[in-house]
Amino acid sequence: MRVTKGAKFIAGSALLMLAVAACGGGESPSTPGGGGTTTAQPVRVEIAEPQHELVPGNTAETSGAEVLNALFIGLVNYDADKKPVNQIAETITSDDQVNWTIKLKDGYKFHDGTPVDAQSFVDSWNYTANGANAYEGNYFMGSIVGYDEMNPVDPDGEGPQEAPAATATSLSGLKVVDNLTFTVALKNPFSGFPTMLGYTAFYPMPKAAFGPDGKVTEAYGKSPVGNGPFKMAKPWERGKDQSISVVRYDEFKEGQAKLDAVDFMIYTDLATAYRDLQAGNLDIMDQLPAEAIGSAKAEFGDRYIEQPSSGVGYIGFPIKTGADYAKSADIRKAISMAIDRKTITETVFSGTRVPADDFISPVVSGYRQGACGEACTYDPVKAKELFDSAGGAKMGAIELGYNADGGHKEWIEAVANNLRTNLGAEVTPKPVEKFATILDDLGAKKWKGAFRMAWIMDYPSPENYLKPIFAAKASSNYSGFDDKAFEEHIKAGDSAKTLEEGIAAYQAADDILLKELPYIPVYFYQTNGAFSQNVKNVKIDPFERIELFNVERA
């Protein structure tokens, strides 16, 4: 997954001064190993602070992924129709959807000059799959033979018993055949396996990433050596530095990027970033604050971007460890029916969002218009009846948590007003400065109330809107949802001979979510971005990633 900050899962004058100081003036340093030397001011791109340091297997939110997309490329990329196309991979083949052979193109290099070879993929995947490393992308390795031995199950979940020790430190299903070939054995047939291989968790890492103890080094997390069109200009100190600086990697096999340097500017407030964009102190935003969308088209003209997005916005609940209202399926349904999605999308978002009626986005196969039915239909009377009959009035105030660095205040306040008016509930919006804090608290089972969440596809498949978020062992399962029938439907979809043949099974899993509502689908995203007069040829892909390789100075 890709959980989002704004459409990306993202304060005062002092912060503004820091942001402007970080992006204004100064020269990008010369860098060894094929990096460009520039005295021009870098192009400045808005992001939120990444949740973790910059390691592919531990990056599961879009701000970190935005940076990694500049630094790395994967086995596959995706065309305009969201179909996988080979990038580093020469071929990805299987006779049975279980045993896969991946052959690589020759000539790709890491930024330190070492070759991108089969071992670099196997080493990276093994490290991400090792449960001891607690990487966010661990779950995506779960279909490979040997994963279970590296990730033994805790017998009592959150109880006092501990999981047994792992019996392996590498995936037995990965085998290096030669420098440019490796094989992958899956536990079960999965026709969608090639489609997922463009996700960040599957990027390769060089030998330089690992220290003598076999661990990814702290230095690598601050200054990752990638294989993409840009390379790090200097190390990034998370929690300290207000920007992440990259420069062009001149020896990139696919040619040179048009830009010589990019600074990813870290903001804790979209409104501040937007003011910087208006003032010319920022060059690209891939998502604008809600309050700016209505006027941005007129202000920026052909420098305004509006297009369909793969994102879905939700209200989520920790259904096992949260407050009483979070644990009640009837209360969750009542809350959903009390939300006036149409008015929120038309008014708060100036018509640039669409009311959500499914967990699966309309941009991928498997979406069904109206699938959510009554639960996503605005009906204040029925919502109030259900809320009262389920004892909602006795369950205390409903907290609505959201990240203040993502431009969510307006729509969360609108939802809160819906619930106060239609349910008679006491509702407390709970802004948190950084989205990473919410994710960390959810992961630690500390968050008790409802929370704002969003998802942008990692790869174009209906499965990606279901399994990575709601499967019991998924690293992005912040709700705690656990349903055996759901898992069986997912398994059936994965095992189908083709993605198309698996859609019905994925939809059956979707139906279970629509009944239980661990999350409430609220709206489907559109991309609403803009860029300054300093740049041109700015495009944003369906994954909410800026296509930096082709951006040019104006």
Question: Can you name each region flagged by the protein language model?
Answer:
Residues 136-209:
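Surface-exposed binding/hinge segments that line
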Residues 165, 175, 333, 345, ...:
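Extracytoplasmic/peripheral linker and loop segments enriched in polar/acidic and small residues
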Residues 354-390, 404-410:
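Structural transition elements
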Residues 365, 388-457, 499:
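Ligand/substrate-recognition segments at binding pockets and active sites
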Residues 186-256, 261:
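Gly/Pro-rich hinge or "lid" segments in bacterial periplasmic/extracellular proteins
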Residues 218, 224, 248-295:
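Ligand-site clamp/hinge motif
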Residues 529-554:
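Long beta-strand-rich cores associated with HINT superfamily self-processing modules
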Residues 46-96, 225:
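N-terminal lobe/hinge region of extracytoplasmic solute-binding protein
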